[in-house]
């Protein structure tokens, strides 16, 4: 009942669920490979090094979830600043749309974490097990001391790199110097243990085993990228008009003879397939598995040099460029097309709005929380008192003094210190008792009445600007 019907003559059966086959990608060198490794170094120096930098005595980049404070150098954000995170995510999304419309999956091929860590893991693999053919022979060889030593060493280094990656990731959310001190005694908290192991093992599994499966099946970007492509998108392309018909070296002669007239420049060496990290044949045309890494371009250019043919049989080009034989200048002129211009305009507007909002935002935030222990109570002389807790969040790099006042009802009075000091990039909870005289309370009767807290940042010798922020709440009168 589960047996598929026989295929018609001349047709091909495509299985929806294909068994994973190990891809042993061949090493390659060239212009694009050098750029890819440059970006590997750049991204990893930033990722591993950023948490260790200090800014005014604190960790420069720290997403302190426990304190609900995010530090990005001199920029301190609180949960009330969630709009900025939303804006940043929108900027990243439109940036990805723009890059994809112009140059295809170039992000995937050069800077995606999956690609970056797979490259690092494959480098370790090549150092210990050899290049493609050596690894294939090692896979087929029976288990012995040499094989166990090579495989064990590889996995040990993979795990070390993966756990260090997990440790660094947690260091963005817990002070990394504290985390480093705890590492020597293995005195991590339960959540720290969980995330170091989870992120580390996820890196180990994704970069060591799943590899191209993540790009082909797990990553949603591979599926919806075609919605952002058009015929003027720069992609890795095979020039079939120049390359076909393919032929082996034997038909071309090896003693300076000219190649047969019926053969194209492609010598059918399959090196472009062997170096591809996703195992595809770029000569079949645009495929969703292609991540745009250009490994096939580098290896093909090397073959063309040896054959004394012009480079560019496989190259970055557009579908229109191949079909219409466009020059490089003509191809780049088509970059400024409506899709790209719209993405660019929206991206610039969002970046401008985000930058302006950050520039003009107040240097502090206020949050009002009612004391849940006692909603309202009677105190001396029949006055009615409500108790609140105000969180004063200083997002500047200098200590600030604040003055708190309350309004909204006649006779309302805030019982709080005249000035409240908050350190640089810190927050402080301040208890505030708000009292209403008995006469006004009797005239109003029971119920909830709107009031407003006004928090004023006092001028300092370095900054005479007076900032003011207001927050609304309610004052409860009991029956």
Regions found by a protein language model. Name each.
Residues 1-246, 297, 310-347:
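Membrane-embedded alpha-helical bundles of multi-pass integral membrane proteins
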Residues 100-115, 207-222, 257-304:
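Cysteine-centered iron-sulfur cluster-binding motifs in ferredoxin-type domains/subunits
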Residues 352-376:
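Hydrophobic alpha-helical transmembrane segments in integral membrane proteins
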Residues 381-385, 424-427:
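Solvent-exposed, conformationally flexible loop/turn segments
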Residues 392-396:
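Asparagine-centered strand-capping/turn motif at beta-strand->loop junctions
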Residues 397-411:
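Short acidic, flexible loop segments centered on an aromatic residue
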Residues 414-441:
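Intrinsically disordered, low-complexity Pro/Gly/Ser/Thr-rich segments with frequent PxxP/GP/PP motifs
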Residues 437-479:
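Terminal connector regions
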């Amino acid at each position: 009942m589960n047996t598929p019907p026989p295929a018609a003559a001349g047709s091909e059966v495509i299985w929806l669920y294909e068994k994973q086959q190990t891809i042993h990608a061949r090493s390659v060198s060239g212009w694009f490979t050098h750029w890819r490794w440059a970006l590997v170094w750049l991204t990893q120096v930033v990722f591993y090094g950023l948490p260790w930098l200090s800014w005014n005595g604190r960790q420069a980049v720290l997403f302190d979830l426990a304190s609900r404070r995010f530090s990005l150098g001199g920029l301190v954000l609180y949960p009330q600043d969630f709009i900025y995170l939303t804006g940043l995510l929108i900027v990243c999304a439109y940036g990805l749309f723009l890059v994809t419309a112009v140059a295809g999956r170039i992000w995937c091929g050069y800077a995606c974490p999956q690609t970056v860590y797979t490259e690092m893991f494959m480098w370790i693999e090549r150092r210990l097990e050899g290049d493609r053919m050596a690894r294939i022979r090692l896979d087929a060889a029976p288990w012995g001391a040499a094989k166990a030593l090579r495989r064990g060493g590889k996995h040990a280094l993979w795990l070390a790199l993966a756990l260090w990656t997990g440790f660094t990731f947690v260091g963005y959310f817990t002070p990394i110097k504290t985390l480093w001190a705890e590492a020597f005694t293995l005195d991590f908290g339960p959540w720290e243990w969980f995330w170091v192991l989870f992120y580390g093992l996820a890196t180990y599994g994704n970069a060591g085993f799943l590899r191209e499966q993540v790009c082909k099946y797990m990553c949603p970007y591979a599926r919806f990228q075609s919605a952002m492509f058009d015929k003027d998108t720069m992609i890795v392309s095979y020039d079939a008009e120049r390359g076909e018909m393919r032929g082996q070296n034997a038909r071309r002669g090896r003693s300076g003879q000219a190649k047969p007239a019926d053969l194209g420049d492609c010598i059918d060496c399959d090196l472009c397939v062997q170096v591809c990290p996703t195992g595809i044949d770029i000569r079949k045309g645009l495929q969703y598995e292609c991540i745009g890494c250009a490994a096939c371009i580098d290896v093909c250019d090397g073959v063309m040099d040896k054959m004394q043919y012009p480079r560019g049989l496989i190259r970055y080009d557009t579908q229109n460029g191949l079909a219409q034989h466009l020059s490089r200048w003509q191809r780049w002129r088509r970059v400024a097309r409506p899709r790209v211009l719209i993405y660019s305009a929206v991206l610039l507007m969002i970046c401008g709005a985000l930058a302006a909002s950050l520039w003009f935002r107040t240097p502090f935030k206020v949050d009002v929380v009612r004391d849940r222990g006692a909603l309202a109570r009677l105190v001396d002389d029949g006055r009615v008192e409500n108790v609140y807790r105000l969180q004063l969040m200083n997002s500047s790099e200098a200590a600030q003094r604040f003055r708190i006042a309350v309004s909204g009802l006649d006779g309302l009075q805030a019982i709080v210190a005249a000035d409240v000091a908050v350190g640089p990039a810190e927050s402080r909870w301040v208890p505030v008792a708000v009292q209403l005289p008995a006469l006004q309370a009797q005239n109003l009767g029971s119920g909830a009445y709107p009031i407003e807290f006004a928090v004023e940042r006092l001028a300092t010798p370095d900054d005479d600007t007076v900032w003011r922020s207001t927050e609304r709440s309610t004052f409860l009168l009991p029956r």
